[in-house]
Swiss-Prot record:
NCBIfam families: kdpC, PRK00315.1. This is Potassium-transporting ATPase KdpC subunit. The gene is kdpC. Keywords: ATP-binding, Cell inner membrane, Cell membrane, Ion transport, Membrane, Nucleotide-binding, Potassium, Potassium transport, Transmembrane, Transmembrane helix, Transport. It comes from the Bacteria. PANTHER family: POTASSIUM-TRANSPORTING ATPASE C CHAIN, POTASSIUM-TRANSPORTING ATPASE KDPC SUBUNIT. The lineage of its organism: Bacteria, Pseudomonadati, Acidobacteriota, Terriglobia, Bryobacterales. Belongs to the KdpC family. It is a single-pass membrane protein. Part of the high-affinity ATP-driven potassium transport (or Kdp) system, which catalyzes the hydrolysis of ATP coupled with the electrogenic transport of potassium into the cytoplasm. This subunit acts as a catalytic chaperone that increases the ATP-binding affinity of the ATP-hydrolyzing subunit KdpB by the formation of a transient KdpB/KdpC/ATP ternary complex. The system is composed of three essential subunits: KdpA, KdpB and KdpC. The chain crosses the membrane at residues 10-30. InterPro entries: KdpC (IPR003820).
């Protein structure tokens, strides 16, 4: 009986430490030091929350930049079903889907004649990547500019202003947050989408 009481006390103490004290301390530190990130890196526009810096959204209108394809959930961009397709490089389903995505990308961007950037036709590991490469953004400039009645140079300037370089100067690649870029487009050309 003595060992059982000791085990129960240890369980209770560690439950309080790891289940209450530690989460409260870490949450308090996060809210105090990194409030924006601790609250989900939410993006506001027009007094409303329109998304998060870290969760991709499905933009389909011609006047918006389109993000990467999503394998999260049945219809994509399902935050509750985050994950990749897990299809290997020799899987015929992946080859067929990629070929279909290339045809779709070319149909949406008929003036683009270069090689389709890989991130324009492949889903990320999470299926919810909010970024595209500057090359993928450049491939969409003509379509977006035409749909918005803007010059391509004005759209390119918005892309450049919303392009982040490598993290710490050497990690990863340059990237464009699609939601932030599309919000900048809405500010530059309101009513034209």
């Amino acid at each position: 009986m003595k060992h059982l009481l000791i085990a129960l006390r240890v369980t209770l103490v560690f439950t309080l430490i790891t289940g209450a004290a530690y989460p409260l301390i870490v949450t308090g530190l996060a809210k105090g030091l990194f409030r924006h990130q601790a609250d989900g890196s939410l993006i506001q526009a027009g007094g409303h929350t329109v998304g998060s810096e870290w969760i991709g959204q499905n933009f389909t209108k011609p006047g918006y930049f389109h993000g990467r394809p999503s394998a999260a959930g049945n219809d994509g961009y399902d935050g509750l079903s985050s994950g990749g397709s897990n299809l290997g490089p020799t899987n015929q389903k992946l080859a067929d889907r990629t070929a279909a995505d290339i045809r779709k990308f070319r149909a949406e961007n008929p003036t683009f004649t270069g090689s389709v950037p890989p991130d324009a036709v492949t889903a990320s590991g999470s299926g919810l990547d909010p970024h595209i490469s500057p090359e993928t953004a450049e491939a969409q400039v003509a379509r977006v500019a035409g749909a918005r009645g803007m010059s391509q140079e004005a759209v390119r300037q918005l892309v450049a202003a919303n392009t982040a370089g490598r993290q710490f100067g050497f990690l990863g690649e340059a990237r464009v947050n699609v939601l932030q870029l599309n919000l900048a487009l809405d500010q530059a050309a309101p009513g034209r989408r």
